[in-house]
Every structure is written in structure tokens, then in C-alpha cells.
Design a protein with these regions (language model features):
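Aliphatic-rich helix starts adjacent to a transmembrane/signal segment
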Residues: 4-52
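Low-complexity, Gly/Pro-rich coil/beta segments used as flexible assembly/activation regions
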Residues: 42-154
């Protein structure tokens, strides 16, 4: 009587396990990249919202309000990245949390710069900066920023 053995040999099983393991490692790497990307996008979204909130507050001030004063003259172009020492105003609550307050995780710094008579006479150019940092492996802290310019008229 002729009987054929059925099933897999140990070598076939090991090769299958190795291939499955390589595939799972790739999926894990993709998951880590997705989580990192989502975190980065969330931080940028919050920073943009904080900058926009500050612009709205500044737009509601009178044209002569001290928060719209051009303290450091001739600093319309602050360079890239801007020199923080040349920026006119800092949020008094710095560092701030996701809502602009001081009760949560305070990871953002908010500044704004005013340039009188830019780009034309009688107009103020307002640029709001929001900075935050992320830990970047062995390289340490990576600084990020959102910069939103607008103009203010009397």
C-alpha cells in the first residue's frame, strides 16, 4: 500500500515564519510613521490655531493700542529663522498650552511683531509666530514654527 505523507516540513514552516515576520516588521514601521505623522500634524494644527487666535485678538484692538506698537524699528524682515530678540511682543503667559492658557502641557511660545507703515503708509503689518519643539532622537530638540502675517488699518 502506497501512502503519501501530508503536511509541511519543518523547513517550509520556518521559511513561512521568516516571511511573515519580515512583513509584520514592515507593518510596525508603517504604524510608527503614521503615529509620528499624526502627532506632527496635530502640533502644527494647534500652533496655527494659536496664531490665528492671536491675530483675531490683535485685530480687535484699537490702532494705537500698546500691543500694536512697533517697539523695535526697522525689523519688518526678521530673517529666517527670525531673531526672537528683535520681535516686538511676547505672550505674557509664555510658554502656553494647546488652548493658549497655562493649565495644560505648556509646549508653545507665541510672539508677534509689528511693522509700522508696511507695506504702505498708515498700515501696520502684524506677524504672529508660534514656536514649539519636538524631540528628534539623537539630534535632540527640533524647533518648529508657524508664521502668519496680516495687515491692520486704522
Amino acid at each position: 500500500m502506497d501512502s503519501k505523507e501530508k503536511g509541511f516540513s519543518i523547513l517550509e514552516v520556518l521559511i513561512g515564519v521568516v516571511i511573515l515576520g519580515i512583513g509584520l516588521l514592515g507593518l510596525i514601521e508603517m504604524q510608527v510613521a503614521a503615529v509620528t505623522g499624526n502627532t506632527s500634524a496635530n502640533l502644527m494644527s494647534v500652533a496655527t490655531t494659536l496664531a490665528q487666535d492671536q491675530i483675531e485678538k490683535l485685530r480687535n484692538l484699537s490702532f494705537t493700542d500698546p500691543n500694536l506698537a512697533d517697539i523695535v524699528a526697522n525689523n519688518a524682515t526678521l530673517g529666517n529663522p527670525p531673531n526672537i530678540a528683535s520681535i516686538d511682543h511676547a505672550d505674557p503667559n509664555n510658554p502656553i498650552d494647546d488652548s493658549g492658557g497655562t493649565t495644560g502641557l505648556r509646549r508653545y511660545l507665541r510672539f508677534w511683531n509689528i511693522a509700522d507703515n508696511m507695506p504702505i503708509t498708515g498700515v501696520k503689518t502684524v506677524v504672529v509666530f508660534v514656536y514649539w519643539g519636538t524631540v528628534n532622537g539623537a539630534t535632540g530638540l527640533t524647533q518648529h514654527r508657524v508664521m502668519i502675517p496680516t495687515t491692520q488699518q486704522p
